[in-house]
Amino acid sequence: ERERGITILAKNTAVHYKDVKINIIDTPGHADFGGEVERILKMVNGVLLLVDAAEGPMPQTRFVLQRALELNHRVIVVINKIDKPDARLEEVEEEVLELLMDLDATDEQLDSPMIFCSGRAGTASLSPYEQGTDLKPLFDTILEYIPAPSGDENAPLQVLVSSIDYNEYVGRIGIGRIENGKMTVGEQVVITNYHDETKKKRTKIVSLEQFTGLGRTPVTEAYPGDIVAFSGAEDITIGDTVCS
């Protein structure tokens, strides 16, 4: 990734704001990594569309936005780097709206909120003419506009594995979002795969972690909407489903 200067694999983190846990996933923007983009978009309830205040929408912006709109995700447009000397705020705002119309966005999607940010300064504002003092306007908009997960913790467990990690102590680690049910350390689960009817392996959850800040925190149980990293299945792969 460093060599190419682009994001290839998604990065997960989570922050707490006003007693709400917000999972944030930085996904690739390039069509070359469409499979990764597809998996990540199915893990989220909404998207922040990051657009450079000087460069405007890029070709990869179109690709990711199109997939997000097709999945009927709510979109918050974040025009970033507004402190650039060559920033074109009004023009870029128009370019984003034109892109949304070109992609046949619904009326609701065309009315997506816009936030004007400086990532370097850590500020956000609802107006292109006002410099923010912190990122509260961005997080308030997320809480107001992006729907919460709709899973049922009393339903059978359902987790789609969207990424794989590895640790020399516990081996392969599956990463995914809990859609329904509750995942608990020590519980017996079944690993299946939609594309391989013969794969039905029973195993035990050995360790369970949630993403917090730039690291992971061990937990004993997790609920719908939580993005978790778990071990216990030696041959788990992307696309597997973990169920009870």
Where are these regions (language model features)?
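Structural and coupling elements of P-loop NTPases
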Residues: 1-244
